[in-house]
Swiss-Prot record:
This is Ig light chain C region. Pfam families: C1-set. SUPFAM superfamilies: Immunoglobulin. It comes from the Eukaryota. Keywords: Disulfide bond, Immunoglobulin domain. PANTHER family: IG-LIKE DOMAIN-CONTAINING PROTEIN, MHC CLASS II-RELATED. InterPro entries: Ig-like_dom, Ig-like_dom_sf, Ig-like_fold, Ig_C1-set, MHC/Immunoglobulin. Residues 7-102 form the Ig-like domain.
Amino acid sequence: RGENVRPTVSIYCPSLEQRNSGSASTVCLVDKFYPGGAQVTWKGDNKVISSGVDTSDKIKDKDNTYSMSSTLTMSSEEFKYSTMTCEVTHPTLTPALAKSFQTSECTF
């Protein structure tokens, strides 16, 4: 594959069912990018969060682009940020691409 492809980024709230069980996992999906050098940074209220992060290896798709996911898990007590952000850096992104949600919106 010759041309660079910008990733699409999606972020998902932890489910209410999971939060009620004592933990909260927020997922960031990074899809369809090339070349493979994408990185994910998690932020809570614009502060970098490094503990509880599990980022998958990138997976090569049939069209020779890559996809990956990153999951941030914390206890329900720690899930007190008002804004959660997944920030993706990639050679095609200047500046980095950030997707966020307000934790008050995570009611489903």
